[in-house]
């Protein structure tokens, strides 16, 4: 029994369903397991956050934004005087570091208002932000969602469309599936669907 088979057997004992496993060493696929057809795309959940961060890096490389840009630079339609003081100090870097200064890690995503709110950016920008940005690590989806929206505002197209020729096409990932918010912006924090081969 190889390591992958041993791992799958242990997961089955715990009633944990594993769809795919690939073990690579020195660019060689050593072991694999597939419960489904390999081309099947599955929700990559928070792997999406890493891809969004790459999108921010590409935008920085192309001079569309800087990590120390204030978030509000990309929202000129908002009057800073009407927003939380900590939001006025928040930067793109703070979002990437999961340090927006929100009240808790499940900010918005477990909130009943999410079910009725269409404009997630507006919801974020009108939050109280009790903590100074960059001083607390609070893992939440909104940091990455806002990074996605900032790249969109800087590039003039959705994060998915921005990354397709610069990232997905170069990796052979054709027509990637990425869920959007009610306003049509790439979710950023999650919602990216990839096959095991596309992820590896």
For each of these PLM feature ranges, what is it?
Residues 3-37:
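A short, well-structured edge-of-sheet supersecondary motif
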Residues 43-68, 95, 147-151, 199:
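Active-site SXXK
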Residues 62-100, 126, 154-194:
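Active-site helix/loop module of the DD-peptidase/beta-lactamase fold
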Residues 14-15, 86-89, 116:
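Extracellular/periplasmic catalytic domains that process cell-envelope and extracellular macromolecules
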Residues 38, 107-190:
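Catalytic-site signature segments of enzymes, centered on catalytic residues
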Residues 83-85, 106-109:
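Short, conserved acidic/polar surface loops in the N-terminal third of protein domains
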Residues 17, 23-25, 30, 89, ...:
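N-terminal core-entry segment
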């Amino acid at each position: 029994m190889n390591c992958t088979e041993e791992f799958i057997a242990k997961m089955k004992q715990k009633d944990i369903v594993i769809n795919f496993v690939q073990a690579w060493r020195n660019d060689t696929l050593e072991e694999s397991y597939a419960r489904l057809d390999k081309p099947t795309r599955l929700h990559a959940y928070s792997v999406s956050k890493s891809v969004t961060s790459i999108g921010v890096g590409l935008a920085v490389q192309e001079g569309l934004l800087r990590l120390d840009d204030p978030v509000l630079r990309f929202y000129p339609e908002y009057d800073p005087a009407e927003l939380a003081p900590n939001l006025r100090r928040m930067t793109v870097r703070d979002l990437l570091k999961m340090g927006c200064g929100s009240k808790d890690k499940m900010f918005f995503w477990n909130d009943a208002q999410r079910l009725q709110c269409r404009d997630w950016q507006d919801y974020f920008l009108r939050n109280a932000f009790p903590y100074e940005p960059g001083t607390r690590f609070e893992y939440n989806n909104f940091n990455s969602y806002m990074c996605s929206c900032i790249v969109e505002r800087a590039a003039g197209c959705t994060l998915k469309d921005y990354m397709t020729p610069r990232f997905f096409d170069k990796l052979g990932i054709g027509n990637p599936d990425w869920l959007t918010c009610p306003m049509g912006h790439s979710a950023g924090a999650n919602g990216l669907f990839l096959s095991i081969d596309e992820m590896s």
